[in-house]
Regions:
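P-loop NTP-binding core
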Residues: 1-206
Length: 206
């Protein structure tokens, strides 16, 4: 199972949800990997406690390899970090991801992440993908590589408008790149049961 957690709106609890789901999966005995694709590295910090120069280069190094050429270039390898939790590993993210993005887009490397996950499939039962709060190279790569998409959602009118746009984008990615991708569910955050708007939004989603 490959699950991407994504919303193009920031501050909706995306990294927290991805880390907690991965931790629960590992606690249940599943061999679990979380790949952090967000240059902010929140999931990396949550799961390793590392910051700044302490963080292994991780997924950025993998994408750099895809840009390399020549007979001796290292290809398709990724460093996997063991967390303090049993059965839970992480591929870390660093700020270098932001610098790599335009180069990766120019070289059309959008399917490289899916190939990596195919290679890791024998080693892990569940793979979670934490993404940046933008519809960019990394999030599209993640949705091409995943088979399930989980969307964190804040109960406000702005989030509702963004959600419908996101669902259209996911459907387009499904049609063009990944017919196996399914929206698994919407995780409602900051729900206030006594307020009328959140209840209206929840009824609409249901």
């Amino acid at each position: 199972m490959r699950r991407v957690v994504f919303n193009q709106k920031g501050g909706v609890g995306k990294s927290s949800i991805a880390c907690n789901l991965a931790a629960v999966s590992a606690a249940e005995g599943h061999r679990t990997l979380l790949i952090d694709l967000d240059a902010q590295g929140n999931s990396t910090h949550y799961l390793t406690g590392l910051t700044g120069d302490e963080v292994p280069v991780g997924i950025a190094d993998f994408f750099k390899q895809t840009l390399s050429s020549g007979p001796f270039a290292k290809k398709g390898k990724v460093d996997i970090y063991e967390t303090p939790f049993d059965n839970l590993h992480v591929v870390t993210a660093t700020a270098e991801l932001a610098d790599l993005q335009p180069k990766l887009e120019a070289k059309h490397k959008i399917n490289k992440l899916r190939k990596l996950l195919d290679e890791l499939a024998e080693d892990y039962d569940r793979i979670y993908l934490d993404t940046p709060p933008a519809l960019n190279f990394y999030t599209v790569s993640a949705m091409i590589a995943a088979d399930r998409c989980l969307i964190p959602f804040d109960c406000d009118s702005f989030s509702r408008q963004a959600l419908y746009g996101l669902l259209r984008e996911i459907e387009e990615i499904k049609e063009d790149h990944n017919e196996d991708l399914e929206v698994e569910g919407i995780v409602v955050n900051q729900f206030q049961p006594r307020a009328s708007l959140p209840q209206q939004l929840l009824d609409e989603l249901i």
